[in-house]
Amino acid sequence: MFSFEGDFKTRPKVSLGGASRKEEKASLLHRTQEERRKREEERRRLKNAVIIQSFIRGYRDRKQQYFIQRSAFDQCTDSAQPGGTFCLADGPNLTLLVRQLLFFYKQSEDSKRLIWLYQNLIKHSSLFVKQLDGSERLTCLFQIKRLMSLCCRLLQNCSDDSLNVALPMRMLEVFTSENTYLPVLQDSSYVVSVIEQILHYMVHSGYYRSLYLLINSKLPSSIEYSDLSRVPIAKILLENVLKPLHFTYSSCPEASRHQVFSAFTEEFLGAPFTDQIFHFVIPAFADAQTVFPYEPFLNALLLLESQSSKRCSGVPWLFYFVLTVGENYLGALSEDGLLVYLRVLQTFLSQLPASPTGTGCPDSTSDSEDDNEETDQPNSPEDGRVSAPYITEECLRKLDTKQQTNTLLNLVWRDSASEEVFTRMASICHTLMVQHRMMVPKVRLLYSLAFNARFLRHLWFLISSMTTQMITGSMVPLLQLISRGSPMSFEDSSRIIPLFYLFSSLFSHSLISIHDNEFFGDPIEVVGQRQSSMMPFTLEELILLSRCLRDACLGIIKLAYPETKPEVREEYVTAFQSIGVTTNSEMQQCIQMEQKRWVQLFKVITNLVKMLKSRDTRRNFCPPNHWLSEQEDIKADKVTQLYVPASRHVWRFRRMGRIGPLQSTLEVGLESLPLSVSEERQLAILTELPFVVPFEERVKIFQRLIYADKQEVQGDGPFLDGINVTIRRNYIYEDAYDKLSPENEPDLKKRIRVHLLNAHGLDEAGIDGGGIFREFLNELLKSGFNPNQGFFKTTNEGLLYPNPAAQMLVGDSFARHYYFLGRMLGKALYENMLVELPFAGFFLSKLLGTSADVDIHHLASLDPEVYRNLLFLKSYEEDVEELGLNFTVVNNDLGEAQVVELKFGGKDIPVTGANRIAYIHLVADYRLNKQIRPHCLAFRQGLANVVSLEWLRMFDQQEIQVLISGAQVPVSLEDLKSFTNYSGGYSADHPVIKIFWRVVEGFTDEEKRKLLKFVTSCSRPPLLGFKELYPAFCIHNGGSDLERLPTASTCMNLLKLPEFYDEALLRSKLLYAIECAAGFELS
């Protein structure tokens, strides 16, 4: 506690010890610095005090002067009443009043004074304007500007009901009209200059913001452009909006013009549209009678966008305005104006928010009824503004109009079209497909370009000719960089990705409609006239093009999995900063977008490559081994690590995830250990481009994967748990269908042991060590796929495909039969069994495809006659309606005719020249897909229950047929000899065996095949040679009875050969046996 002892002054501290000579250096320096700091703080405090005092004195004086001038103004207004001494009909007096008001004006206190002054200025406008012709012209011009600025500020409070906006609006009208100035000043050029200066000052003072608020406040929300003549204020407001634009367009310098358009854009068009703007103002601007400087506006808009450091939030509304108003001005644009228009479309379309519903893209996930209902409502319920999603949809719809499409197509198709035109057009199309998820058939611009051969050729030429400068100074094609897997700069990728994506997408779409005859350049004669081809490339050009596309895909895979950890290079940072990206989070977002663009590019190129490969598979146009890549050397013994036992997906399978030249992080599914870069690349190739690997290697990989899975399921021991079934030989299919159903045996990967009963119900001799099961499975598949069974039919070429009428035969359980047959075929593949089942190509394609649907080009393998008729209809040049077709097909199943509508109400829709393409594709889709969809889906599910479809997708339809039935190649006797076993006293040196091989060497290839079928039940050798045959081919001593015929046990691949020492006798007996297919019962 402190006490007061009478001292009220601080006394200096006196050190009685004297000055210490031992003061340390650090202490001295610290004390000196502290004293200096205190002196500096004192000086700053005094300076700040002077500033504050000066401000207070100025504020007090201004308040005093405001009061004095306001009082003087009020005295003048009082004196200006009738009978007063102050005359308003005098220019200097008006100038004095204006000067006073401008000095003290405060909107909260002086609004009424301003209104009174406006009233008198309008009344005596000529006297006031006359001051512009005297010595006070600059002062008068400044006063008019300030008055108009206050007028704009006043109108911004138009929502206040107490404010009468008539006088401020009349003020705007009077003092921006030439009629006010010309009678007084008489110099028209000076008048125009004065009005321009006034308008520019007003624009800087929020003129368009005031008009925006005024329109939304004073016009009813239900107003439309047709109401213009009935609502006088609407016409005045519209004129006021256009006035600065017209003056700006006529004679204003470019910089000032840009300022006016900038204000108009940001303050009037940049905000979400209200009903008044959307339904009245925009249609008014779009009216041809309303003259609007559209081309200068586009130039200013492009300049404004280039100078902006960040994206404008009002892009949807600006873009809608550009498209809507441009409908009446596109035809009048100059060539330079059209190029500017193209740039504006490219810029704003890329900034347009992604479409919320898409337009039928498979990737679209917003397809619920609620979402659709929301987008149908233009206004949001909160504030009556038109929503951004609705405007976005409207922009995309307007961009797809016939006029817009023709304008853009004319730009591209003209002979003088530059590389910039093609590049920007590609960017627009790329944005439509990628960002807005619009499909080629749904957009008029896209499908028009897709079927223009000249455009596609030129597009590929641009892609091939794009180059970049390397560090060494040499120019290298960008396509070559991609093929090498070399990273490229952000600018280079932005140049080539849109072009490459567009080319791949459009060419893929055009290939769907180009039938094989047209693709291969065969002449097409219809009604005596030769049809023009839509093929943009010759077969020779396609060979080179397909090789480039293949290498590009492989290069992108290398970019996805770089050998060294990638870094964000300096040029990427610079490129991102140039578009306003500064923070790390924004940069990472841009990097992810760049990665996504590479992924999307990879997908469309891969799709195009697969389509070309499919054509080559159906009818070869490429040289042998064309699709094999010399860059990739994938061996079966190097990919065993791709099998993951724990996951039971038995495949480290993933589609291409986030890939790009910037970062290598892929979303990985279930896996045990991380893969190396080489393994990642191999996996990507095997899943996306398997045909670049030789077929033999893929077969080895497939068999190794099967073996690895079998080791997990069955194990090595012969007595592990398996499946034991008893089957009656005369009822193989019925018993197997019952006892091997999913309910009884959910896992067919287990080892199956079969016990057969003969026709009399007695046990057949023998214990199943694998051979009886193979014989059982072979007979089961023959029975199940026999057309007489009713589940499969044959084409004209004898190829199997699901019977559409199967449901009529077995009822609703037909899908279970197809599931069962799929499982059995999968079991044959799983056990490496060859079965001679010739399937139709389109059916195998449906099994391998991810969508289970195939296109019209496969129709020829199902019904060549229908295919030819549809091609005839496509090229028919007479009146199509005369053919009397409608959107129906007729099924004749089991003698019963049934009419099926291809679309709702199809029987009442005639086929015309306009809709025949749709009819053709609907017919093909019905025959190939809809009619047998449940059959194929059930069969696929059964097949996938035993063998992963991802493994099978390493092969095309022809290769799968070879995998099922073996290749039609000559039987190699040397290979067969090398892997033949002998029993019962025979050996390789036995005389009978030597005679046997001499006899077989003299057989024709057909006779050798019959021998092979006689012993193994399959006429084709194993894919990888007889070393893969299990059990091995074996010749057993059949005894010395020369009257007996050679017999075979196909379940054991065993030939029982009697001891024929006479070559002629052995030949005749053996040929008789194989021709008659002698078994146990024929001796």
Swiss-Prot record:
Residues 1-60 are annotated as: Cis-determinant of acceptor ubiquitin-binding. Residues 45-74 form the IQ domain. It holds the Pfam family HECT. Pathway: Protein modification; protein ubiquitination. Keywords: Isopeptide bond, Transferase, Ubl conjugation, Ubl conjugation pathway. InterPro entries: E3A/B/C-like, HECT_dom, Hect_E3_ubiquitin_ligase, IQ_motif_EF-hand-BS. It catalyses: S-ubiquitinyl-[E2 ubiquitin-conjugating enzyme]-L-cysteine + [acceptor protein]-L-lysine = [E2 ubiquitin-conjugating enzyme]-L-cysteine + N(6)-ubiquitinyl-[acceptor protein]-L-lysine. It comes from the Eukaryota. The active site is at residue 1051. Residues 1-10, 20-40 have a biased composition (Basic and acidic residues). GO terms for biological process: protein K29-linked ubiquitination; protein K48-linked ubiquitination. Autoubiquitinated; promoting its own degradation. Its EC number is 2.3.2.26. The keyword Transferase applies. SUPFAM superfamilies: Hect, E3 ligase catalytic domain. Residues 366-376 have a biased composition (Acidic residues). Coiled coil: none annotated. One of its GO terms (molecular function) is ubiquitin protein ligase activity. There is a cross-link at residue 903 (Glycyl lysine isopeptide (Lys-Gly) (interchain with G-Cter in ubiquitin)). It is an enzyme of class 2 (transferase). Residues 744-1083 form the HECT domain. Residues 1-40, 354-386 are annotated as: Disordered. E3 ubiquitin-protein ligase that specifically catalyzes 'Lys-29'- and 'Lys-48'-linked polyubiquitin chains. Accepts ubiquitin from the E2 ubiquitin-conjugating enzyme UBE2D1 in the form of a thioester and then directly transfers the ubiquitin to targeted substrates. Associates with the proteasome and promotes elongation of ubiquitin chains on substrates bound to the 26S proteasome. Belongs to the UBE3C family. Interacts with 26S proteasomes. Interacts (via the HECT domain) with UBE2D1 and, less efficiently, with UBE2L3. This is Ubiquitin-protein ligase E3C.
